[in-house]
């Protein structure tokens, strides 16, 4: 049994659609409910939501929807709204207040160490936690789960614009985050003991605080013991989130079976994975993907068909398999939210209208998938 949990970083906007500081000194509107809890982040224009531990993907999506509703109500209590995307298209980081000073020692220490790297990393991700039973080969799974992280980045890509400019990328968010140390693609580790020994060394020489872990695209969480996948942009469509969670859960289950049967394949280097990560950041679901086991390149339909064939046997029944197969096919037709956002910005013609459209997608069950083939 693999359990699931989700964290989302949600943008707080004003009536113009621009990022705005939220007053976290005021009481949260039911900050902790059975489905999860809300928290602050380093930038005051962010609400972070955290679901409870979930047993299934449908349960996870129910909690994600309910936590987004909580964030909407929290924002509305101060006349604000929410927006869901990996980067805000127009707001500038220099204008965003931070949680700093003596009242926020954790964030103050980050700002003191990383300076404008932390101030300017105005990004919004979603983190999927996979929880394993005692004795599961978590590090062996993590080493190989790294291989498919660029694919889920492509499925989630939602940050083509930055400070009013089209960056030419599908996910600009990683251009902001990868400036941090101990960020990006994880190394492969021989064992959990070797991984923990490295973390302990970093703490001993002052690189990490006692309650800090690595910030890489996937990590063994230092408190929860989960595998935390951190590579994804936030995405307005809960169904796309469900597809990503399903693929990662089934891939982890497949890896666990292979490892226990002694059939695991080779572990790819960080350098090899970074090649596919760049392709995902640049081209999204139009990327040409490298299979480093074969040294071959394939287009997205063929590549994802091969991945689907690998993990689909993990479905609990034909109905579940058919449901997610249909949504994967839809995703490959619709392309990324970055594609759709570019198309809408061009069609609507100005940022104010585009931001209002984006905000409307964060309303309850308001997201209607749109194909973006015209931008090919």
Which role fits each region the language model picked out?
Residues 88-91, 159-170, 263-271:
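Short proline/glycine- and acidic-rich turn/helix-capping motifs at secondary-structure junctions
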Residues 55-124:
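Well-ordered mid-protein domain cores that form the structural environment of catalytic cofactors
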Residues 105, 109-126, 130-186, 190:
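Metal-dependent DNA replication initiation modules
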Residues 41-47, 80-92, 118-129, 159-160, ...:
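Core alpha/beta catalytic barrel or barrel-like domain that forms the active/cofactor pocket
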Residues 86-90, 134, 233-235:
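Active-site-proximal loop/turn and secondary-structure-junction residues that shape catalytic pockets
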Residues 1-78, 110, 177-376:
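C-terminal accessory/tail domains of diverse enzymes
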Residues 38, 99-103, 156, 173, ...:
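Short alpha-helix boundary/capping motifs
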């Amino acid at each position: 049994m693999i359990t699931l949990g989700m964290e989302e970083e949600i943008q707080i906007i004003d009536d113009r659609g621009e990022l705005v500081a939220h007053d976290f000194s005021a009481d949260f509107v039911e900050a902790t409910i059975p489905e999860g809890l809300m928290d602050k982040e380093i930038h005051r224009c962010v609400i972070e939501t955290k679901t409870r531990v979930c047993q299934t993907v449908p349960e996870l999506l129910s909690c994600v929807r309910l936590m987004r509703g909580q964030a909407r109500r929290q924002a509305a209590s101060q006349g604000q709204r929410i927006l869901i995307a990996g980067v805000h298209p127009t707001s500038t980081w220099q204008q965003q207040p931070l949680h700093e000073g003596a009242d926020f020692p954790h964030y103050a220490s980050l700002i003191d160490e990383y300076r404008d790297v932390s101030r300017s990393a105005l990004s919004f991700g979603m983190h999927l936690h996979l929880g394993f039973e005692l004795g599961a080969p978590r590090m062996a799974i993590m080493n190989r789960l790294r291989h498919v992280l660029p694919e889920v980045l492509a499925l989630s890509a939602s940050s083509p614009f930055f400070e009013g400019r089209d960056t030419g990328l599908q996910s600009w968010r990683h251009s902001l985050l990868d400036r941090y140390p101990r960020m990006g693609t994880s190394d492969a580790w021989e064992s959990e003991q070797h991984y923990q020994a490295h973390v302990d060394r970093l703490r001993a020489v002052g690189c990490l605080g006692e309650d800090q872990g690595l910030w890489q695209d996937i990590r063994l969480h230092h408190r929860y013991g989960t595998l935390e996948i951190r590579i994804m942009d936030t995405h307005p469509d809960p169904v796309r989130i469900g597809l990503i969670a399903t693929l990662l859960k089934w891939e982890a289950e497949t890896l666990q079976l292979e490892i226990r049967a002694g059939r695991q394949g080779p572990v790819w280097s960080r350098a090899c994975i970074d090649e596919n990560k760049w392709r995902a950041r640049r081209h999204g679901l139009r990327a040409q993907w490298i299979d480093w086991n074969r040294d071959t390149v394939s287009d997205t339909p063929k590549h994802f068909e091969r991945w689907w064939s690998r993990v689909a046997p993990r479905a609990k029944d034909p109905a579940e398999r058919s449901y997610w197969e249909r949504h994967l096919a839809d995703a490959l037709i619709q392309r990324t939210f970055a594609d759709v956002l570019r198309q809408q910005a061009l069609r609507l013609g100005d940022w104010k209208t585009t931001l209002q459209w984006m905000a409307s997608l964060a309303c309850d069950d308001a997201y209607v998938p749109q194909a973006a083939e015209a931008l090919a």
